[in-house]
Amino acid sequence: MNSTSFRSCCFATASLLAVLPVAFAETPPASQPPVIRMAPAAAGLPALPAVLRNETQDQQDARLQWFREARFGLFIHWGVYAVPAGSWQGKPTGAEWIMNQGKIPVADYRAFARQFTAAKYDPEAWAQLAADAGIKYVVITAKHHDGFTLYDSAFSDWNAVKASGAQRDLIKPLAEAVRKHGLKFGTYYSQSQDWVNLGGGKGKTEPWDEAQKKGDFDTYMKTIALPQVRELLDKFNPDILWWDTEYQMTSERARPFFDLVVAHPHLIQNSRLGGGVLGDFRTSEQRIPASAMQGRALEVNMTINNSWGYRSDNLNWKSSQQLIRNLSDITSKDGNYLLNVGPTAEGVIPQPEIDRLLAIGRWLKVNGEAIYATRGGLYVQPLNWGRTTYKTRAGGKTTLYLHIWEWPADGKILVPGLKQTPRSGRLLAGGVPVTTTITDSGLVATFRGTAPDPDVSVAVFEFDTPLEITNATALPTDTGASGTLLDPSKSPPAH
């Protein structure tokens, strides 16, 4: 993932890309108009049309259906950076960014790979953990910014088979195990930054080692990055291609990568390829947006502690309650929650991460129907007692879920602007009935007793008609450029 300083540069670049006169699409048949999303223009400059694919809206919706319904994914940051584990020359220095932030010479960093043994790596156990946690898809760093691939690449010997103590492909067995459990599989690939392979980008940073000054970026693009992406697609047939960092990715450089994606009809990509390509879903890093937005799907990627890669001194674990509420919050904003773990160099997921994932899984076993295959966005602003999601059914019927974070002292919760009487209401935990009345302000739900769940209690209501919220504020529209920060005034933590 990307550091604060690089991130700011990246988004400034994204705005400037609006001047480029390139549209990534062939002329479609008249019966199949393309889906077009316009990147925002810099002041006084024309916008760049960024065509996702030659497909109708219905076709795009069908391709993204599983992703929109999944709601919960597992991110895995694993690589050579797990060996120094956040420490270089006796000083705490980042995690997955340690080579860059510590200015570690290429030869010294390469030497770490011999200790990257994956000796305790159990892909079946990882997949089982994901399934038990209620995860629906898994994304792993096939290549992070250090250029090291977790599989045997024919285009660089800087990989798990040829350069590391693991001496084997680490991607294939995980892909197989994940799919055996019925989950989707995705690969993360750092297309522009590569601190080891010749010619790879260094982000905003100047080369810190003479070995990095050899080669040029376009040659790297053509001889390493593009062939490796083709390898990933051919070897593992991922369901998601998760790009990261857009530095130096002009439209001309992005076009060949875009063509590879389009050649795989099922493939979904995020918003970080660059060159004006908006992607199928927008990516928010370490930040939950203020509201849902109309337009592209949303994925919020976040850590369980404060780092993505393994860092031995990072013990600032988020509570399971916070993580469950994050899932509730993001789903209520019509997004997916991609939650990260950082295994050790031996391939061990830290126990605090396991414990928290399993806690989420236990909550989902009771309340999962309020998360999976639901939609969010009923309210632009969060409600003071919690969040809402809903499902529409045949014949106009609707199921409404109240995610109750703050259990009411008087037993009453107002659903503002909703003046329809439900056919039924109950708590998901225990099935206790919930009564409702209609007031001038909206629907009031009355609960008995105490909260059935200290983290998030969920009530479900069945309606025979579509929901109508009076005095509702329209959702903002997603017109952001590829990878745009949802709140540009705030920079994310180093990543």
Model-derived features with residue positions:
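N-terminal secretory signal peptides that target proteins for export/translocation
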Residues: 1-6
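Bacterial N-terminal signal peptides
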Residues: 10-21
